[in-house]
Swiss-Prot record:
Keywords: Cell membrane, Endosome, Membrane, Phosphoprotein. It holds the Pfam family Flot. It is a peripheral membrane protein. CDD domains: SPFH_flotillin. GO terms for molecular function: protease binding. Heterooligomeric complex of flotillin-1 and flotillin-2 and caveolin-1 and caveolin-2. Interacts with ECPAS. The gene is FLOT1. Belongs to the band 7/mec-2 family. Flotillin subfamily. This is Flotillin-1. It comes from the Eukaryota. One of its GO terms (cellular component) is membrane raft. One of its GO terms (biological process) is positive regulation of skeletal muscle tissue development. PANTHER family: FLOTILLIN-1-RELATED, FLOTILLIN-RELATED. The modification Phosphoserine is found at residues 19, 163, 385. It comes from Bos taurus.
């Protein structure tokens, strides 16, 4: 089963499988009942009132000292906790406090025996540090740490400390009387010095005031001279500036007249230029504009006629080629139909083909020239060389017809010229 303890307590588990014993400060531990044993030890801080009655000091004067010490078993240090468990396990807090108290009192007595009453009385910090240092080194071996030690009280039964106080009081009173007399003396001296310094300061002040008055009058006279000089210079400068200003005004007036005259000349020149531009705009520019307009109109009309003629010629050419293609298609159809005729004309072979082509050529020529018969107007554009007029039209038509055998050859694969020049074969 589990056992727990707070941070101010430690548990020691011994017995089966617990060698050495397990020590747990502020936690929990598992204990097997009956075969393992658990014991607890307190880690609380203990306050000890350490009294040493009638202890003889180094000079043999018996005094009594009371100190306050705070001690506790150190649970964070495993070695000190183990030492404390070995010495105090199973003991109560009172028993542990008694052991620590006896140890501290012994060390306190030892320190008192090595110091005088005056040292203990006047330097309590030194006494406390020595007791703390010596007692700590001894109690550490028991697992106890000294948290703090403070000297609380010192007294004796022989009025030794009281006598020390009386002597000190008398000395203080003596020093006070001496100090009072010296203070009165010093006060008188300082008062006399103060009066002397006051008179000296008054005289010095009057001297300084006289010097200041003299310096003021001298500076005022110099200032008046400078002011009058500056005033005269200012008057002369003003008159000179007035003369310069009048001269500048006259120069500016002359310059204004020159500028006005120059502006009049510029205005006249601008008027002349304006009249010239007006004349040019009224006479020259309209003539040039009209000439330019006529030139542009002529060029536009020329371009329009050229483009119109090219468009019409292209239209005629494309219609002719389209109709020729249609005729060629019909010719191929008829050629297939005439294949049987060709078998009947085995004796004539090429002659039969030539006969059929020649039979259809008038129809082809008629279809090609047909669009020309429906044209209302033919516009011819000449580049300056070649035929003109009707001869030009005739030449164009003949040119189209001259390309007819070539077109037939591309469409049918039969060359009219070659067939015409071959001799007829008989069966």
């Amino acid at each position: 089963m589990f056992f727990t303890c707070g941070p101010n307590e430690a548990m020691v588990v011994s017995g089966f499988c617990r060698s050495p014993p397990v020590m747990v400060a502020g936690g929990r531990v598992f204990v097997l009942p009956c075969i393992q044993q658990i014991q607890r030890i307190s880690l609380n801080t203990l306050t000890l009132n350490v009294k040493s009655e009638k202890v003889y000091t180094r000079h043999g004067v018996p005094i009594s000292v009371t100190g306050i010490a705070q001690v506790k078993i150190q649970g964070q240090n495993k070695e000190m906790l183990a030492a404390a468990c070995q010495m105090f396990l199973g003991k109560t807090e009172a028993e542990i406090a008694h052991i620590a108290l006896e140890t501290l009192e012994g060390h306190q007595r030892a320190i008192m025996a090595h110091m005088t009453v005056e040292e203990i009385y006047k330097d309590r910090q030194k006494f406390s540090e020595q007791v703390f240092k010596v007692a700590s080194s001894d109690l550490v071996n028991m697992g106890i740490s000294v948290v703090s030690y403070t000297l609380k009280d010192i007294h004796d039964d022989q009025d030794y400390l009281h006598s020390l106080g009386k002597a000190r009081t008398a000395q203080v009173q003596k020093d006070a009387r001496i100090g009072e007399a010296e203070a009165k003396r010093d006060a008188g001296i300082r008062e006399a010095k103060a009066k002397q310094e006051k008179v000296s300061a008054q005289y010095l002040s009057e001297i300084e005031m006289a010097k200041a008055q003299r310096d003021y009058e001298l500076k005022k006279a110099a200032y008046d001279i400078e002011v009058n000089t500056r005033r005269a210079q200012a008057d002369l400068a003003y008159q000179l500036q007035v003369a310069k200003t009048k001269q500048q005004i006259e120069e500016q007036r002359v310059q204004v007249q020159v500028v006005e005259r120059a502006q009049q000349v510029a205005v006249q020149e601008q008027e002349i230029a304006r009249r010239e531009k007006e004349l040019e705009a009224r006479v020259r520019k309209p003539a040039e504009a009209e000439r330019y307009k006529l030139e542009r109109l002529a060029e536009a009309e020329k371009s329009q006629l050229i483009m119109q003629a090219e468009a019409e010629a292209e239209a005629v050419r494309m219609r002719g080629e389209a109709e020729a293609f249609a005729i060629g298609a019909r010719a191929r159809a008829e050629a297939e139909q005439m294949a049987k005729k060709a078998e009947a004309f085995q004796l004539y072979q090429e002659a039969a083909q030539l006969d059929m082509l020649l039979e259809k050529l008038p129809q082809v020529a008629e279809e090609i020239s047909g669009p020309l018969t429906s044209a209302n107007k033919i516009t011819l554009v000449s580049s300056g060389s070649g035929a003109m007029g009707a001869a030009k039209v005739t030449g164009e038509v003949l040119d189209i017809l001259s390309r007819l055998p070539e077109s037939v050859e591309r469409l049918t694969g039969v060359s009219i010229s070659q067939v015409n020049h071959k001799p007829l074969r008989t069966a």
